[in-house]
Swiss-Prot record:
Regulation: Activated by tyrosine phosphorylation by a wide range of cytokine stimulations. When T-cells or B-cells receptors are activated, a series of phosphorylation leads to the recruitment of TEC to the cell membrane, where it is phosphorylated at Tyr-519. Also activated in response to SCF. Integrin engagement induces tyrosine phosphorylation of TEC in platelets. STAP1 participates in a positive feedback loop by increasing the activity of TEC. SOCS1 is an inhibitor of TEC kinase activity.
Binding sites annotated in the UniProt record for ATP: L376, G377, S378, G379, L380, F381, G382, V383, V384, K398
Keywords: Adaptive immunity, ATP-binding, Cell membrane, Cytoplasm, Cytoskeleton, Immunity, Kinase, Lipid-binding, Membrane, Metal-binding, Nucleotide-binding, Phosphoprotein, SH2 domain, SH3 domain, Transferase, Tyrosine-protein kinase, Zinc, Zinc-finger
Domain of life the protein comes from: Eukaryota
Molecular function, one GO term: non-membrane spanning protein tyrosine kinase activity
InterPro entries in UniProt: Kinase-like_dom_sf, Non-receptor_tyrosine_kinases, PH-like_dom_sf, PH_domain, Prot_kinase_dom, Protein_kinase_ATP_BS, Ser-Thr/Tyr_kinase_cat_dom, SH2
Protein's UniProt keywords contain Membrane: yes
A single GO cellular-component term on record: cytoskeleton
PANTHER family reported in the protein's UniProt record: TYROSINE-PROTEIN KINASE
Known EC number: 2.7.10.2
UniProt modification remark: Following B-cell or T-cell receptors engagement, translocates to the plasma membrane where it gets phosphorylated at Tyr-519. Undergoes also tyrosine phosphorylation during platelet activation.
Protein name per Swiss-Prot or TrEMBL: Tyrosine-protein kinase Tec
PH domain segment(s): 4-111
Organism listed in the record: Homo sapiens
Length: 631
């Protein structure tokens, strides 16, 4: 952790009111910003005076608050906001210059965070609602597009006449590396789709020129060619950055690791993955001779010494200064492992991640570039077909039936939805809006709908595979929650399965654009009552916490291998039962631990339910815990 101070100043903070009963007050605090923490103290910057802190990596948005000459009940009149986790901290600076400096420095520190918001609330949360859009849910999605890289909403004041005579000195660099060139390494190949794109070749280095967009960066290759590249296809060239190594799999749980190692079926197949304990790593290793002639898996935690400098080891007698050195050593020496690390197993080079659109700022797709193939199915909006874009990339194409959707609203929102990019979300690539019917072009998922996938393979799933499916969905939903985006119709039917068995969340937010009253009215025959909490079927109050309820029902669908919730009851009967406290029964394949997670999702009051962040932490622990599966 780097404790070098970037900024330090006495500011005023408003209480975050994390609970409804929390008082609203304003207190003077000493704020200290470092590379890793924003901390505030009462009086002096000493641990015993610390009143609170925010992990910089958890910050999703920093911006000036628009107040429109409203009353500010404290002496500092220049507010800005720091959005983190599920909370917003309002801070008041003594001058516009002070505020601009804090916003600028904070934005510099969060520019590489992977949780930056798509939309935010530009005005205060006051008296139970946002002053900008009057939404009454604190976790309601933002109402204005947020661009981390744009300058603040307030124009800089013109310099005083005497300062025009000479240029101000350059700012003092925080660290030498801030002024150095940023070199990245391509983790995947990328073919340039448009003239302004730059081709990527796996393993090659590139110089970053601009980061004006979270998802697309401007870069230069070794030949001097310049263009835009997808930011999730490259990683920083640093000795401690594991992403550049073939054997490292960032988002890989125990169950998925075993599936991948088993499919390769090579003696000594291995990978390094993130442990369920944050900041730690696990080596997953496959052997065909795991004892008594059977094949098996071994999972070794990479341990750290308490000495300085810190060292890492799998076998205590063989400690090294870095993780790559450990791997290199054990490639040649078993040294306490069941076998040496012979063959790196990875998804890199096989399944490149999706991109936010096919190219930088390309969201309108020319229909002549689409080739239509077989029909995949039909839904609320119309027929879905397998197709190809430019005869090369497989895509799913939804032809929107006339009168099925509020098209104008959706087209505007599509630009925002395209920027929602996560390995566990079905990617929206673009739309065709210049003709009727309009087309929605998304990522193609080979194994189709999760509900059908479960039903067609009943009796063939292990408990850990089922839990891994829930983990996939929870990861996607945690990303939506982080970006203040509500799904509104989460269910197994609205999740899709890839060729590799990865489950991804689909159709997020689409329920808002349905025009069918039978679907949108809680009394309609098509309304998904069986997936809805009381506040939705009674008052149509959607939030991330209503999505959490639906996630609990989805977990139940998964662990019953695709059964219909409350299958013997009508929607009216379900409303009555749920209102009286009745909940779905425990599936046979669900352990007590897993069913307990479902019950937490079905708490009557929204505030009693966990966040997706909490759920993901719990499920991660269950996935890693062998006892859960009775092994």
């Amino acid at each position: 952790m780097n404790f070098n101070t970037i900024l330090e100043e006495i500011l005023i903070k408003r209480s975050q009111q994390k609970k409804k009963t929390s008082p609203l007050n304003y207190k003077e605090r000493l704020f200290v910003l470092t590379k890793s923490m924003l901390t505030y103290y009462e009086g002096r910057a000493e641990k015993k005076y610390r009143k609170g802190f925010i992990d910089v990596s958890k910050i999703k948005c920093v911006e000036i608050v628009k107040n429109d000459d409203g009353v500010i009940p404290c002496q500092n009149k220049y507010p800005f906001q720091v959005v983190h986790d599920a909370n917003t901290l309002y801070i008041f600076a003594p001058s516009p210059q002070s505020r601009d400096l804090w916003v600028k420095k904070l934005k510099e520190e969060i520019k590489n965070n992977n949780n930056i918001m798509i939309k935010y609330h530009p005005k205060f949360w006051t008296d139970g609602s946002y002053q900008c859009c009057r939404q009454t849910e604190k976790l309601a999605p933002g109402c204005e597009k947020y661009n981390l890289f744009e300058s603040s909403i307030r124009k800089a004041l013109p310099p005083a006449p005497e300062t025009k005579k000479r240029r101000p000195p350059p700012p003092i660099p925080l660290e030498e590396e801030d002024n150095s060139e940023e070199i990245v390494v391509a983790m995947y190949d990328f073919q340039a789709a448009e003239g302004h794109d730059l081709r990527l070749e796996r393993g090659q280095e590139y110089l970053i020129l601009e980061k004006n967009d979270v998802h697309w960066w401007r870069a230069r290759d070794k030949y001097g060619n310049e263009g835009y590249i997808p930011s999730n296809y490259v990683t920083g060239k640093k000795s401690n950055n594991l992403d550049q190594y073939e054997w490292y799999c960032r988002n890989m749980n125990r169950s998925k690791a075993e599936q991948l190692l088993r499919s390769e079926d090579k003696e000594g197949g291995f990978m390094v993955r993130d442990s369920s304990q944050p900041g730690l790593y696990t080596v997953s290793l496959y052997t065909k001779f795991g004892g008594e002639g059977s094949s098996g898996f071994r999972h070794y935690h990479i341990k750290e010494t308490t000495t300085s400098p810190k060292k890492y080891y799998l076998a205590e007698k063989h400690a090294f200064g870095s993780i790559p050195e450990i791997i290199e050593y054990h490639k040649h020496n078993a040294a306490g492992l069941v076998t040496r690390l012979r063959y790196p197993v990875s998804v890199k080079g096989k399944n490149a991640p999706t991109t936010a659109g096919f190219s930088y700022e390309k969201w309108e797709i020319n229909p002549s570039e689409l080739t239509f193939m077989r029909e995949l199915g039909s839904g609320l909006f119309g027929v879905v077909r397998l197709g190809k874009w430019r005869a090369q990339y497989k895509v799913a194409i939804k032809a929107i039936r006339e009168g099925a959707m509020c098209e104008e609203d959706f087209i505007e929102e599509a630009k925002v939805m395209m920027k929602l990019t996560h390995p566990k979300l079905v990617q929206l690539y673009g739309v065709c809006t210049q003709q009727k019917p309009i087309y929605i072009v998304t990522e193609f998922m080979e194994r189709g709908c999760l509900l059908n996938f479960l039903r067609q393979r009943q009796g063939h799933f292990s408990r850990d595979v089922l839990l891994s499916m829930c983990q996939d969905v929870c990861e996607g939903m945690e990303y939506l929650e982080r970006n203040s985006f509500i799904h509104r119709d989460l269910a197994a039917r609205n999740c899709l399965v890839s060729e590799a068995g990865v489950v991804k969340v689909s159709d997020f937010g689409m329920a808002r654009y349905v025009l069918d009253d039978q679907y949108t009215s809680s009394s309609g025959a098509k309304f998904p009552v069986k997936w809805c909490p009381p506040e939705v079927f009674n008052y149509s109050r959607f939030s991330s916490k209503s999505d959490v309820w639906s996630f609990g029902v989805l977990m139940w669908e998964v662990f019953t291998e695709g059964r219909m919730p409350f299958e013997k009851y009508t929607n009216y009967e379900v409303v009555t039962m749920v209102t009286r406290g009745h909940r779905l029964y425990q599936p046979k394949l669900a352990s007590n631990y897993v069913y307990e997670v479902m019950l937490r999702c079905w708490q009557e009051k929204p505030e009693g339910r966990p966040s997706f962040e909490d759920l993901l932490r719990t499920i991660d622990e269950l996935v890693e815990c062998e006892e859960t599966f009775g092994r």
